[in-house]
From Swiss-Prot:
PANTHER family noted in UniProt: HEAT SHOCK PROTEIN 70KDA (PTHR19375)
Superkingdom of origin: Bacteria
Keyword annotations from UniProtKB, A to Z: ATP-binding, Chaperone, Nucleotide-binding, Phosphoprotein, Stress response
Xref: NCBIfam families: PRK00290.1, prok_dnaK
Keyword Ribosomal protein recorded: no
Annotated protein name in UniProt: Chaperone protein DnaK
Entry-linked InterPro entries: ATPase_NBD, Chaperone_DnaK, Heat_shock_70_CS, HSP70_peptide-bd_sf, Hsp_70_fam
MF annotations from Gene Ontology: ATP binding; ATP-dependent protein folding chaperone; unfolded protein binding
Induction: By stress conditions e.g. heat shock.
Family from the record: Belongs to the heat shock protein 70 family.
UniProt key word Iron: no
Sites bearing Phosphothreonine, chain numbering: 182
Species annotation: Mycoplasma pneumoniae (strain ATCC 29342 / M129 / Subtype 1) (Mycoplasmoides pneumoniae)
Function: Acts as a chaperone.
Amino acid sequence: MSTDNGLIIGIDLGTTNSCVSVMENGRPVVLENPEGKRTTPSIVSYKNNEIIVGDAAKRQMVTNPNTIVSIKRLMGTSNKVTVKNPDGSTKELTPEEVSAQILSYLKDYAEKKIGKTISRAVITVPAYFNDAERNATKTAGKIAGLNVERIINEPTAAALAYGIDKSNREMKVLVYDLGGGTFDVSLLDIAEGTFEVLATAGDNRLGGDDWDNKIIEFILAHIAQEHNGLNLSNDKMAMQRLKEAAERAKIELSAQLEAIISLPFLTVTEKGPVNVELKLTRAKFEEITKQLLERTRNPISDVLREAKIKPEEINEILLVGGSTRMPAVQKLVESMVPGHSPNRSINPDEVVAIGAAIQGGVLRGDVKDVLLLDVTPLTLSIETLGGVATPLIKRNTTIPVSKSQIFSTAQDNQESVDVVVCQGERPMARDNKSLGRFNLGGIQPAPKGKPQIEITFSLDANGILNVKAKDLTTQKENSITISDNGNLSEEEIQKMIRDAEANKERDNVIRERIELRNEGESIVSTIKEILQSPEAKDFPKEEKEKLDKITGGIDAAIKANDYTKLKAEIENFKKWREEMAKKYNPNGDQGQPAQ
């Protein structure tokens, strides 16, 4: 595989789903994953020393306790997740390591699609992400073998994708982003190719998954009513199917007024099988999720108030995230910003990745006349006398930026000072997030308040903070670059990179085997559906026997980890399907037996 050192992919590393895009012939193109989908669940499963990412991991989300979801919520923290090894021992993983598995999966299939080795990326983050979270994202990219050229805010990426920078007038743009696991609202000012985030607000514990959960509660209540209080909330297999059915129903209700939830043989009780056949109307769906929708109202008001912008001054509304397809969401946004219909011309699941790819084009020089001016999401301060947090860079300051301020000593003849850096809006340093500290020594003894110590905060375009302290009398100085709060040393990062590289070939083999296993399991499920369908009664006995034989062969191959046999059985099924297609549909139109 050839290497293109100039190629930069754009990655939307989402809480629930991720997406990768690249510039081809001057246009952004979203790349499909091995399952033919344009977005990939941000889910990682660990099973028998295998690492499973994406849709395959999602399918075992409930049944496999070693499945990790929403790892993005832990970025920038010292929290770790624990997984069990086959021998019963446990292993702790940092959020960066888990996120790196997702990024590595995206990188690998992008390389296969493009046919070139990829080493550079632009990755998006929520506008509210702090310095630690941004650093953690860069570290995850590094572990995955990616040089993260730029971290950009998701709303900025969305505006880039919509080409609003091409307008010849200044525009105020509201970006409403309701993803699977988080909700953000941002207000951007765009003029002459320059982007500035004026304000941002949101709820990082609200997303489309919450709408799914309301449907699950609705179904569980129906089951309890119909089956004498039956509670399936602890039945892992049943909950996995309920989760999938709820998501399907939510999607259907965005396009139609009712959805049929059909779950045959959901479980078996003493009285026999439990079958669910339930109609959910859009009106009922909106009723049971009304409180969730209302939680998105205040953040819209907050960003308008903070930016001192009236609703009528908004020029454009952009909807981001698959959950914005829900009609109730669109109605709420229109009601709060009257006179404007939200722009939905780009797939909301893909728009952020597309914007990231365009930013990659900007960095390469392929896209001209675009300047991104993001903002810092929280105030950056130092702790001064009495534990006060004295701000140097205030919240929503445009970055990159550098700010300096003169401080002095708190005691007579003090020969050193501790510089404590914190982040947050609280007036006392102890109530804010501590980012780091360092010591400046060699100060000439003098009465307190006499020495002049210059503190400089420099925040780069990626939101990475460098803090420098300088004694203006002695010219002595010291500095610190704030690293992520996960406390990963460079040695630990390098070890993770080496481990990833050393295991790359093995991981590829494992991934291919997982794909085979997934295909085999999918075929078994398909065969069971065929045999349970009404049309199955018309099948000749020998055809049913063929299917039973294929099913048995696949199950045996999977249990024995015999991937050669598994591949052969998969081919047997494909041949059978082709024969059935010709037999039942000589004109080539595939009918029911070939489904």
